[in-house]
Amino acid sequence: MAVEKLADSSKDWKSEHKALTMKVNIAGEEVLLAKPQTYMNLSGEAVQALMTWYKVKVDHLLVFSDDINLDVGRIRCRKDGSHGGQNGLRNIIEHVGDKFPRIRFGVGKCPPKFDLSNWVLAKFSPEDRPAFEEAISKVPALVECYFKLGIEKCMERYNGK
């Protein structure tokens, strides 16, 4: 969802290296958007393949992910760090290391006796949907902040919002 907020509706997604990609301009920078087409837990395969093909350094990677440890609609920006139990991030870290910035979007805790993978793929309840949509609507401004001012400024502006 977050990547779609950055996409150019006049362009088509291209299938390559286990991902759908699109080049866009953000804050004067040419940016490669990517949506891995692997299983979520294998996202690192697509990320590593694209980074190798396009010769992208790990510190030029920006990853969006969901986070069940954040309330719905909360945003957390990080310069680097652990996977925090998120299997897609875990796989990316296994493939390229952990020295890349990431933006996490809260999806709330998984209810007891509910399958976690079904929880993160499920539609939001009518009560939670507005909070998540508000968070996702901040993506263009957040990413522009990242390119113009850096991840630290994004952390100041958006963490906990």
What are these regions (language model features)?
Residues 1-80, 90, 94-103, 111-115, ...:
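Nucleotide and nucleotide-moiety/phosphate-recognizing core
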Residues 83:
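Conserved TIR/SEFIR loop-to-helix hotspot centered on a Trp-containing motif
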Residues 86:
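Active-site PLP attachment segment
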Residues 107:
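Gly/charged, well-structured mid-domain segments that form the phosphate/adenylate-handling core
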